[in-house]
């Protein structure tokens, strides 16, 4: 969340940020927050004055009682009235602070100066692209749905029977190819890029969702187990970031870099009218996630590193892609700056998002209370957190199948994956 001191000192800047994000309705929340903040500070000052008066009156009563001269009854009555007022103000303050925190949690992050202004995804900027891999696709192309069904490697109908729409089944060489993708990406990120592998829980508590910003703003997107008060993770970003919640790290611990493979679960509420065929929008998918902890002076270098690591996977797989710098109206509420990587799916005839790489600066760290001690021994300060998909396999699988299809209807396996799959092509319905 944003620092209340920053909001107090820069209300116009925060209001402008909300306009840039196309969240003008939140300006009312900002104004309410500023009003509550003034009331809170006034009440704190008044409470401090009353407590000072209570201490003085208490000492005066003690002096009168020790001297045995005069009556302290009037002072005792006065002190009781002061104590009652303090108690009432403390209760009001507690309620006011809870409302302030709720408003702070609901406001989005500030925007980096490089973020282009725009209203929606159409205004995102192409940052760079790499489309010139040698895939000879000069024949009628199938999409991943038709390829998967014909080759017997993907079964969406049985997934729908078992669970419901949006829960795919991988079979035979499709399952092995999915596992190969996951293992290849983990090996790249750990052995080559230097990330520490983590195998985290798949369910988290509400405090963890609040720490990364999924709660309360995106509460309708997560699956909830009512009896256990736990949530299925929408991304490994949640457990990886909350590993250090309520901790003070040493400067020598920074930077931290974690990589994790997990299934991810998303309700995709509000997806009505969007293309939900096959892997284009699913409720369960696999992803290798990258999370970094950095200092304020190094976090934007770390963002470029995460982006290059995600791109490196696509370059090794020789899958055409482009990188978008998201505009102010499309960037997530939690991020200060974000790049999306979109893979080219020739069978679909369009680009598909396969990764988002974001810097949150101290927005998540404030929510999760993650700090570090500077090397000079100064006061602990908040870390900067970053994350990137490295990558999500569902849309990556779409691009792989569609780019590596042959005129004969087979699928060639990328060279870097063949040691993991144990086969070089998929050309028959089942094993």
Swiss-Prot record:
From the UniProt record, which GO molecular function terms apply? ATP binding; serine-tRNA ligase activity
Give any single GO term for biological process: selenocysteine biosynthetic process
Q: What is its EC number?
A: 6.1.1.11
Q: EC top class, in one word?
A: ligase
Asked if the keyword Transport belongs to this entry, the reply reads no
Q: Gene Ontology cellular component?
A: cytoplasm
* Protein localization: Cytoplasm
* CDD domains listed in its UniProt record: SerRS_core
Keyword annotations for this protein?
Aminoacyl-tRNA synthetase, ATP-binding, Cytoplasm, Ligase, Nucleotide-binding, Protein biosynthesis
Query: Pfam families of this UniProt entry?
Result: Seryl_tRNA_N, tRNA-synt_2b
**Catalytic reaction annotation:** tRNA(Ser) + L-serine + ATP = L-seryl-tRNA(Ser) + AMP + diphosphate + H(+); tRNA(Sec) + L-serine + ATP = L-seryl-tRNA(Sec) + AMP + diphosphate + H(+)
Q: Which residues participate in ATP binding?
A: 266-268, 282, 353-356
Q: In which pathway does it act?
A: Aminoacyl-tRNA biosynthesis; selenocysteinyl-tRNA(Sec) biosynthesis; L-seryl-tRNA(Sec) from L-serine and tRNA(Sec): step 1/1
- UniProt-listed InterPro entries: aa-tRNA-synt_IIb, aa-tRNA-synth_II, aa-tRNA-synth_II/BPL/LPL, Ser-tRNA-ligase_type_1, Ser-tRNA-synth_1_N, SerRS_1_N_sf, SerRS_core, tRNA-bd_arm
Annotated L-serine binding lies at 235-237, 289, 389
What is the protein's major site of localization? cytoplasm
Q: How does it assemble?
A: Homodimer. The tRNA molecule binds across the dimer.
Domain comment (free text) = Consists of two distinct domains, a catalytic core and a N-terminal extension that is involved in tRNA binding.
Membership in a protein family: Belongs to the class-II aminoacyl-tRNA synthetase family. Type-1 seryl-tRNA synthetase subfamily.
Function as written in the Swiss-Prot or TrEMBL entry: Catalyzes the attachment of serine to tRNA(Ser). Is also able to aminoacylate tRNA(Sec) with serine, to form the misacylated tRNA L-seryl-tRNA(Sec), which will be further converted into selenocysteinyl-tRNA(Sec).
**PANTHER family hit by this protein:** SERINE--TRNA LIGASE, SERYL-TRNA SYNTHETASE
Q: Indicate what this protein is called per its UniProt record.
A: Serine--tRNA ligase
Species whose genome carries this gene: Prosthecochloris aestuarii (strain DSM 271 / SK 413)
């Amino acid at each position: 969340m944003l620092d209340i001191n920053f909001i107090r000192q820069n209300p116009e800047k925060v209001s402008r940020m909300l306009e840039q994000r196309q969240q003008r309705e939140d300006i009312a929340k900002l104004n309410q927050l500023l009003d509550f903040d003034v009331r809170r500070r006034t009440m704190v000052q008044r409470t401090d004055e009353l407590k000072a008066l209570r201490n003085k009156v208490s000492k005066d009563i003690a002096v009168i009682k020790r001297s045995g001269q005069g009556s302290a009854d009037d002072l005792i009555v006065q002190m009781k009235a002061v104590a009652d007022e303090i108690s009432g103000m403390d209760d009001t303050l507690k309620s006011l602070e809870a409302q302030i925190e709720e408003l702070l949690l609901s406001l989005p992050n500030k925007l980096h100066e490089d973020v282009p202004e725009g209203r929606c995804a159409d205004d995102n900027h192409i940052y760079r692209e790499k489309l010139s891999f040698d895939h000879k696709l000069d024949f009628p192309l199938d999409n991943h749905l038709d390829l998967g069904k014909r080759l017997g490697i993907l079964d969406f109908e049985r997934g729908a029977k078992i669970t419901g729409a949006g829960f795919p089944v991988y079979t035979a060489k499709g399952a092995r190819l999915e596992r190969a993708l996951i293992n290849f990406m983990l090996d790249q990120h750990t052995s080559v890029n230097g990330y520490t592998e983590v195998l985290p829980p798949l369910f988290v508590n509400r405090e963890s969702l609040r720490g990364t910003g999924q709660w309360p703003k995106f509460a309708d997107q997560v699956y909830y187990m009512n009896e256990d008060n736990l949530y299925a993770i929408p991304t490994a970003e949640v457990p990886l970031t909350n590993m250090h919640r309520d901790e003070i790290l040493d400067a020598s611990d920074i930077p931290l870099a974690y990589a994790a493979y997990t299934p991810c679960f998303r309700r995709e509420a509000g997806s009505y009218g969007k293309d939900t065929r096959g892997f284009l929008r699913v409720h369960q998918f696999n992803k290798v996630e990258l999370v970094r902890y950095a200092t304020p002076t190094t976090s934007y270098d770390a963002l470029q590193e995460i982006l290059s690591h995600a791109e490196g996977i696509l370059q090794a797989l020789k899958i055409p892609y482009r990188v978008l710098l998201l505009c102010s109206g499309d960037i997530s509420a939690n991020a200060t700056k974000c790049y999306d990587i979109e893979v080219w799916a020739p069978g679909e005839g369009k680009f598909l998002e396969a990764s988002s790489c974001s810097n949150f600066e101290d927005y998540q760290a404030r929510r999760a209370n993650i700090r570090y001690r500077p090397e000079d021994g100064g006061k602990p300060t908040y870390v900067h957190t970053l994350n990137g998909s490295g990558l999500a396999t569902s849309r990556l699988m779409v691009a792989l199948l569609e780019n590596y299809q042959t005129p004969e209807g087979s699928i060639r396996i990328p060279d870097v994956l063949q040691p993991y799959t144990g086969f070089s092509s998929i050309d028959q319905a089942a094993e």
